[in-house]
């Protein structure tokens, strides 16, 4: 299936790109999500005319996302959970919980589908979590999972010590 992107898509292309994709990917994801349109001759002509409008709209969205990125940068989310004696959680910290807490902290709604977890968080410790804000912009948030507030503070002090040691090595 040949499509024209009307929004930037991560690892696929930018606005106005004409691409050949698998039929199922186009039909089931790109078209319903309004990320692309079919690449017919009238649509190709239309995109050439409207490409500047799409790019201006995307630039506006990107500027808004950069403001959100400034709010998210340096955020530390603390989750207090019950654990077994060896630090394993009874359950896990999910991307939805991270999105909810982050949204609460910055007063802006972040969707759980934008939270990228490499693996499930099932034990206490410090984790870095990637947040996809835009096709071309990701933010990093520190997630601290601990049994108590005091343990979370210990993790934070430990992290600051490691950071200052790393900076001292670079100097």
UniProtKB/Swiss-Prot annotation:
Pfam families given in the database record: Ribosomal_L9_C, Ribosomal_L9_N
UniProt xrefs under InterPro entries: Ribosomal_bL9 (IPR000244), Ribosomal_bL9/RNase_H1_N (IPR009027), Ribosomal_bL9_bac/chp (IPR020594), Ribosomal_bL9_C (IPR020069), Ribosomal_bL9_C_sf (IPR036791), Ribosomal_bL9_N (IPR020070), Ribosomal_bL9_N_sf (IPR036935)
UniProt keyword RNA-binding, yes or no: yes
Keywords tagged on the record: Ribonucleoprotein, Ribosomal protein, RNA-binding, rRNA-binding
Gene Ontology biological-process entries: translation
GO molecular function: rRNA binding; structural constituent of ribosome
Keyword NADP attributed: no
Protein family membership: Belongs to the bacterial ribosomal protein bL9 family.
PANTHER family, per database record: 50S RIBOSOMAL PROTEIN L9
HAMAP family assigned to the protein according to its UniProt record, in alphabetical order: Ribosomal_bL9 (MF_00503)
Function recorded in the entry: Binds to the 23S rRNA.
Designated name of the protein: Large ribosomal subunit protein bL9
Organism: Rickettsia conorii (strain ATCC VR-613 / Malish 7)
Lineage start: Bacteria, Pseudomonadati, Pseudomonadota, Alphaproteobacteria, Rickettsiales
